[in-house]
Amino acid sequence: MAAPSQEDPSLERHFKGHRDAVTCVDFSLNTKHLASGSMDSTLMIWHMKPQSRAYRFTGHKDAVTCVNFSPSGHLLASGSRDKTVRIWVPNVKGESTVFRAHTATVRSVHFCSDGQSLVTASDDKTVKVWSTHRQRFLFSLTQHINWVRCAKFSPDGRLIVSASDDKTVKLWDKTSRECIHSYCEHGGFVTYVDFHPSGTCIAAAGMDNTVKVWDARTHRLLQHYQLHSAAVNALSFHPSGNYLITASSDSTLKILDLMEGRLLYTLHGHQGPATTVAFSRTGEYFASGGSDEQVMVWKSNFDIVDYGDMKARRPPPLTSSSGTLPKMDLPVPPGRDRSLESVQGEPQESISMPQTLTSTLEHIVGQLDILTQTVSILEQRLTLTEDRLKQCLENQQLIMQRTPP
């Protein structure tokens, strides 16, 4: 059940125009446009403003599998089963440049945060990095031994994460082009992967119906969710980093509270598998697509109070032990932040404390929030260990029962 300050997500719009399953969605920077790709080989640019006409982009010769707006919103990249990547100018003309990126289906396209680079992933088992403006090939990452479903840059552009049908998630250093770590905990094909907005964690979705969250610095499993009854096809972090949304072949979307480590909402909207989901850049909206050919836009609502407060007050960053990896920037838990607001909202003269003391107390509160988060993570690990121990004991009992006296 949601906290009293939260409201339920609500369906704002639904768009019909694709003639086959929707495979991907992405919002523009200003949330004025939403792009979607489909098995019908087209891209659609939907206007969030009511009564506005959508643009249909044709050019790909086969299913469009992935789409991503550049950070500025002036360009749009798409990948296809026709083995090409197209860079579009998202206006009524629908002009694009095309380049043959891979020797098999292109599964994923993603712009770096500076807009200068593009990373692509393919069924040819490679991840490739390109210069955006000239579409010049820069380098390949080639350690996967099966189709690569997804590849993303970290928020600071220094790392790349990839997910594959070889059941691994790999973390790469963009500069050295070396694989830093392989995460092998998934029990099936890994369908999607992304970085937490802070860059310190990685979340991956799999055909084994699970979502896993790892620490990108220590490479330890932090959270494990088995909430869907079928494959998880996509996921998206809320910009605050406090929430994660998933789309599954069980036809549902699920919203997770990462701070509490629990399920917040299950949304039923699509008839058939929900294939894709993405938050807008502000987190105010999220969009989903499905095999029912529909694109749905939802208003988040549940983050209205918390996210505004979190942007205003965050604890001091916890520096990484390694200089080559990003810093930790933990968001303030919702409950803690609301209690802070009730104190800080009082008139200044009623709190006669020196500025230095106030700063010290705020620093202590920030550190307490970090400790709260750490304890929560430890509880998750303990639960996971208990589950594994229980499974081992049950397996041992089965073996004992089957062994003849």
Swiss-Prot record:
It is found in: Cytoplasm, Cytoskeleton, Microtubule organizing center, Centrosome, Centriole; Cytoplasm, Cytoskeleton, Cilium basal body; Cytoplasm, Cytoskeleton, Spindle pole. Residues 313-352 are annotated as: Disordered. Residues 341-352 have a biased composition (Polar residues). Disulfide bonds: none annotated. Residues 367-395 form a coiled coil. Pfam families: WD40. Widely expressed in embryonic and adult tissues. One of its GO terms (biological process) is positive regulation of centrosome duplication. Keywords: Cell projection, Cilium biogenesis/degradation, Coiled coil, Cytoplasm, Cytoskeleton, Repeat, WD repeat. Belongs to the WD repeat POC1 family. Interacts with POC1B. Plays an important role in centriole assembly and/or stability and ciliogenesis. Involved in early steps of centriole duplication, as well as in the later steps of centriole length control. Acts in concert with POC1B to ensure centriole integrity and proper mitotic spindle formation. PANTHER family: POC1 CENTRIOLAR PROTEIN HOMOLOG A, WD REPEAT-CONTAINING PROTEIN 55. This is POC1 centriolar protein homolog A.
